[in-house]
Each structure stands twice: as C-alpha cells, then as structure tokens.
Swiss-Prot record:
It comes from Schizosaccharomyces pombe (strain 972 / ATCC 24843) (Fission yeast). The lineage of its organism: Eukaryota, Fungi, Dikarya, Ascomycota, Taphrinomycotina. Residues 195-217 have a biased composition (Polar residues). GO terms for cellular component: nucleus; spliceosomal complex. The gene is slu7. It is found in: Nucleus. This is Pre-mRNA-splicing factor slu7. GO terms for molecular function: pre-mRNA 3'-splice site binding; zinc ion binding.
Length: 379
C-alpha cells in the first residue's frame, strides 16, 4: 500500500488512505452501534428524561394556560391524572370560607365543640366568642357545622404564599384610591377658584379705591422713611445685641422699652429655667473640683447635692457675718449713744427749769412794781 511505502505523508493523504481502509474492511464500531440502536424498538417512548431540569420539565402552576401554545411540550413530563384536574395548582378551587352545612342542631352532640356545639372543630380551634357556660352545659345557641374541604394539591402549591389569592380583590383598592384622587383634585380646583376670586376682588378694590378688611395685608417691604432702631440719633446709649436680636442700654441687663413693634423683645427668663441654670453651673463647678455630678444622667442626686451645698454655704456665711459683728459691731450702738447725748443737751434738768422760772417770775413782779411807783409819782 501507498501509505506503507511513504513514511512521511500529508494529512490529506493519510485521511484518504484511512477511508480507503475502512471501505475495504467494513463499517466502523461507532456505525455498528448506531445501527443497532436504530433497529432496537424503544420500550417506553414516554419515559421521563432524567437529564431535563425540573424547571423545564414541569411548568409552574401560575404559568399554565389552556389557550396558550406550549413551546416546550417535547420536554414536559407526561401529565398524570390528579384529583385537581392533572395540575399542580388549585386553580378554580380553594377552601370555602364561612360556609355552613345546613341548619344547626337542636341539642348538643357528643364529640362536638364544647363552646359553640359544632362538630367540625374542637374547643381549642373554636373561633367563636368564649362563653361563660358553653353549649355542652346549656344546650343553647348551637352553631352549624362548617364545610371542610379536602383539596389535594402539589408540594409547591401548598407552600405557595399567593395560593388562593384572588387578584380581582385589588380592584377595590384601586377604586378607593381613584375616588380619593378625584376628591383631592376637586378640592384643589375649588381652592384655585377661591384664590382667583380673591385676587380679582383685591384688584377691583384697589382700582375702585375701596379696601376690604380681608384684602388688607401687611407690607412686606420697609418704607423709605423708616430708620432702623440702632441708627436713630436719639438712641446714643443703646447697643444692639446680635445674640438676642434686641436693643439694650449701657448696663446690658434691662430691656429698652421700644414702641416700634417690639425691637427690644426677649424671652422671659426666671423661674424653673433660672433654677436649672444654677443647677447646671453647680454641676460644672463640682466637676472641676473633682466631684462627679451629672444633672442629666441623675437629676435627683444632682438636686440633693445642690441643696446640701447651698445649705452649707448659707451656714458658713452666717458664721462669717456673726464673727464680724462680734468683732467690730454693727454700728447701731454708736448711733444710739450719739442720739442719747444730743437728747441730754437739748432737754434741760427739771431743777434748772424751776429756778429759771422762779427768777423770771420775780423779775417780772419787780418791773411791775417799779412801773406802778413811777405812775404814782407822776400823779
């Protein structure tokens, strides 16, 4: 053969010689296996293919539609007859809620619910209001039995959270929101109409020269002749405090009475606010000195410490004042001594007063006698 004579051959020559050999010898092993597979009849043509994934072999229950064209029918597993119509879903059937089985019984039956008297459930599953004395003992107001359905569904349908949901119920929610939107739009239209009417009325009033009380508004711009409070010539001693946005005098503590619309207004201080500020200052000073006092974390302890400190300061101040008074006096004794001396100088003795009065009386009698003598001599 040619391939044996030539040691080095091209790929084309080698493949041609190989095909020649195969035609001479017969069909290859692969072709023989394929012919045998074709000639053997399939035992079960509807057998499940284990290599097809489940999400392809079984369509979900919510995606099934009788009218739609099945595009993956060649990969679906054969439908099995199930009580729910050969589907894994419960389409068209679900638990009936609140349906009763005919009229209620007239007397209590053995094995029924002790609370309401129905045979469809026990006491622990009863949804009726708990009675003081149940139907078992009273035999009154026995409820009818509920309809209990046994629906066989697949594993996925049992665990599907949307199973049994009716999408038509959401239409009620949409209708409710649409009504709210309509009412809101109507309110906005009415408000716009009222605003337009008010604007027109104000324009008409300004044109005609008559001003209505409703159309009078405060001017948003300052008048040209208006002067700011801190630029006035008569307020030389006033100072503007930007923190409180007010005008203050030189002391800075008293507010200035301003008649120009409350330029010197400030929030009222004192009362509990002042007490809290004192307590906060005490806490800060105590923390600096090493005492741990926290007003926010423990306000009761802080208040007690503040009161103790206040009482101790008052007692120490009293001791200091008393020691100063004992050493130097309060000055009232000297004033009393001066007043007493002045009174002694001003008020004379009673004996001196008697002597002076007697001497005055004697002098008066002597003068009268002299006058009488002179008169008699003249006569």
């Amino acid at each position: 053969m040619s391939y044996m004579n030539n040691t080095f051959q091209s790929n084309y020559d080698y493949s041609k010689d190989k095909n020649f050999m195969s035609t001479d010898i017969g069909p290859s092993m692969r072709e023989m296996k394929a012919q045998k597979r074709r000639s053997r009849p399939m035992d079960n043509p509807d057998a499940d293919n284990p290599y097809i994934p489940k999400f392809i072999s079984t369509a979900p229950w919510y995606a099934q539609d009788d009218d739609a064209v099945e595009r993956l029918a060649h990969q679906r597993i054969g439908k099995k007859e199930t009580p729910s119509g050969g589907r894994s879903s419960i389409e068209g059937s679900w638990y009936v809620r609140g349906k009763k089985l005919g009229p209620a019984a007239t007397k209590y039956r053995k094995g029924a619910c002790e609370n309401c008297g129905a045979m469809s459930h026990k006491v622990k599953d009863c949804m009726e209001r708990p009675r003081k004395r149940g139907a078992r003992w009273t035999g009154e107001d026995i409820q009818a039995d509920e309809v209990i359905q046994d629906i066989n569904v697949s594993w996925d349908a049992k665990r599907d959270r949307w199973n049994g949901y009716d999408a038509t119920d959401y239409k009620k929610v949409i209708e409710r929101y649409e009504k709210l939107d309509e009412l809101q739009n109507k309110g906005e239209e009415n408000r716009d109409a009222s605003e337009n009417s008010a604007v027109k009325a104000s324009r008409n009033s300004t044109v005609s020269g008559s001003e209505d009380s409703a159309s009078i508004t405060t001017p948003s711009l300052r008048m040209r002749e208006d002067v700011v409070a801190y630029l006035r010539a008569d307020n030389k001693n006033l100072q503007y405090e930007p923190k409180s946005r007010s005008m203050r005098d030189e002391t800075g503590y008293h507010m200035v009475d301003d008649s120009s619309g409350g330029a010197g207004f400030v929030k009222a201080s004192g009362g509990e606010k002042e007490d809290f500020e004192k307590l906060q200052m005490f806490a800060w000073e105590a923390e600096r000195s090493g005492t741990r006092v926290h007003v926010v974390a423990n306000p009761t302890a802080g208040e007690l410490e503040f009161r103790k400190n206040k009482a101790s300061r008052m007692t120490t101040q009293k001791h200091i004042d008393q020691s100063i008074l004992d050493r130097y006096g309060d000055g009232t004794s000297k004033v009393k001594d001066k007043k007493a001396k002045n009174n002694e100088k001003e008020v004379p003795d009673l004996a001196i007063l008697d002597k002076s009065e007697k001497s005055k009386g004697e002098s008066n009698t002597d003068e009268e006698s002299e006058n009488l003598v002179i008169v008699e001599g003249d006569l």
